[in-house]
Structures are given as structure tokens and as C-alpha cells.
């Protein structure tokens, strides 16, 4: 169930999927951001612009939480990190749903991100059982 990176470090499938989600959130945000950066007709910025940064920050937090959970020896110590991972994936998923209502061609890529989060959750379930 482990993969190896090019520099011979063990990378678990859940770690790899978290990195994939992070990369995907950056790409989607870069694609959506120019559409949201324009001022609206009322002169105000689109409030959804902040969700693009939020999904990047949240997905960036997944890997450190995974690493910390894997480093802990006792299940009680791991629990905090496991809960954090669950919260992060839920918030990323919710922010994807919010961004799907925006006026941008980039929103077409958000279902892909949501599918990746669903795959991550399945991996997470198996991974949690193996810790």
C-alpha cells in the first residue's frame, strides 16, 4: 500500500492523493481567479474570490496532518490529526460547492476536485484502519 517517490522516500497512497488535491486546487484557483478578480457592476469585488484561496490553504494543510498522524505512536495522539483531516476535506468539499455557483469557465473543473476528494475519503477510511 506504499508508493516510493523518486528520492526513495515512502509515500502512502493517501499522502499522494493529498498532494494531487493540493496541485489541483492551485490549478483550479489560477484558472478561476482572473474571472473573480474583476469588480462587479456595483463596484465591489466578488465575495467568492476568497474561496479560491481557502481551498488552497485547506488542501495545503492535509499533508502535514497526514504526516503527523502517521508519526504518532498512540491512537489517542493520532485522533486530533485524524479529526483535522476529516474537517479539512469537508470544508474543501463545501467550498467547491460554493464555487460551482460562480460565473467562470473554471467552475467546470470543480466536479473533478470533488471526485478527487471522494477518492481521498475512501483512501482515508482504509488508511485510518491501518494506523
Located regions from the model:
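Amphipathic alpha-helical assembly/interaction segments
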Residues: 1-131
Amino acid at each position: 500500500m506504499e508508493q516510493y517517490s523518486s528520492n526513495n522516500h515512502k509515500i502512502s497512497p493517501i499522502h499522494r492523493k493529498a498532494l494531487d488535491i493540493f496541485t489541483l486546487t492551485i490549478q483550479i484557483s489560477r484558472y478561476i481567479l482572473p474571472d473573480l478578480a474583476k469588480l462587479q457592476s456595483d463596484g465591489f469585488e466578488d465575495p467568492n474570490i476568497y474561496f479560491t484561496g481557502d481551498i488552497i490553504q485547506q488542501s495545503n494543510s492535509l499533508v502535514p496532518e497526514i504526516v503527523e498522524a502517521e508519526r504518532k505512536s498512540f491512537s489517542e495522539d493520532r485522533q486530533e490529526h485524524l479529526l483535522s483531516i476529516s474537517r479539512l476535506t469537508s470544508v474543501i468539499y463545501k467550498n467547491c460547492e460554493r464555487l460551482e455557483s460562480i460565473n467562470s469557465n473554471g467552475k467546470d473543473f470543480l466536479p473533478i476536485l470533488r471526485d478527487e476528494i471522494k477518492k481521498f475519503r475512501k483512501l482515508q477510511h482504509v488508511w485510518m484502519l491501518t494506523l
